[in-house]
């Protein structure tokens, strides 16, 4: 179950009534969630993008480093005004966004940052909010692909072209990413391997195969596609205006 599900009465009833030997938690965990886990369960394994400061078995793909990679990709392509769409509290991807800007002596403007749930709906609303602020962003970093999908729809509905007017990059590399138009540039997270490794570690813990907490950090890579190409020196609109001027001369 996810960190969101854990406090639901039905979830608690399900795992206690069935005498669960161990649990796997997906996603972010706050202190309240950790206290709950410590109280009721001996064998706990966590998998996600945010490293936990706790003595539990963990299989992660470092969301902080993945965000740095995504941001460094955009900055390397010439973007200096980069928007953020996603969650900002207890979120390593937001921390990575800010750290990447700081490393390049760029300030994360508040108007560039939109705090929304990580979902297609959240991305859609987040992009509409960002665009309504009339910022001068040239690229947007979305916390995950579902958020990016919603954001891309809102950007297109606003009459903007991706990537000519606005580049988009995200994290996950779900199957849908390569079938979008344009195809989504994203950081590939080895979700299947993370799940398999977490299950193996939890079973080993239940069978008393190990007692010391294990932390495994799996690698990611950039799936470089169409939504984030090198930035042109001139925008299509500017080039169009120059063409008209030459014709008038």
Describe each region flagged by the PLM.
Residues 30-31:
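Short acidic, S/G/P-rich loop/turn micro-motifs used as interaction or catalytic elements
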């Amino acid at each position: 179950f996810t960190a969101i599900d854990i406090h639901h009465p039905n979830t608690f009833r399900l795992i206690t009534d069935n005498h669960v030997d161990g649990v796997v938690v997906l996603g972010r965990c706050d202190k309240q969630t950790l206290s709950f886990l410590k109280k009721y369960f001996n064998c706990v394994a966590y998998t996600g993008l945010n490293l936990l400061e706790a003595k539990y078995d963990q299989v992660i793909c470092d969301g902080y480093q993945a965000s740095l990679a995504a941001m460094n990709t955009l900055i390397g392509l010439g973007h200096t005004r980069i928007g953020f769409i996603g969650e900002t509290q207890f979120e390593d991807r937001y921390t990575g966004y800010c750290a990447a800007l700081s490393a390049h002596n760029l300030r994360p403007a508040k108007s560039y940052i939109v705090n929304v749930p990580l979902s297609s709906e959240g991305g859609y609303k987040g992009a509409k909010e960002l665009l309504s602020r009339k910022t001068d962003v040239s690229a947007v970093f979305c916390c995950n692909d579902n958020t990016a999908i919603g954001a891309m729809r809102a950007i297109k509905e606003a009459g903007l072209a991706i990537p000519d007017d606005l580049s988009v990059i995200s994290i996950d590399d779900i199957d849908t990413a390569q079938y979008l138009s344009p195809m989504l540039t994203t950081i590939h997270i080895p979700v299947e391997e993370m799940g398999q490794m977490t299950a193996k570690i939890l079973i080993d813990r239940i069978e008393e195969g190990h007692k010391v907490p294990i932390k495994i950090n799996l690698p990611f890579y950039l799936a470089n596609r169409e939504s984030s190409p090198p930035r042109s020196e001139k925008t299509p609109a500017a080039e169009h205006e120059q063409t008209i001027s030459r014709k008038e001369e």
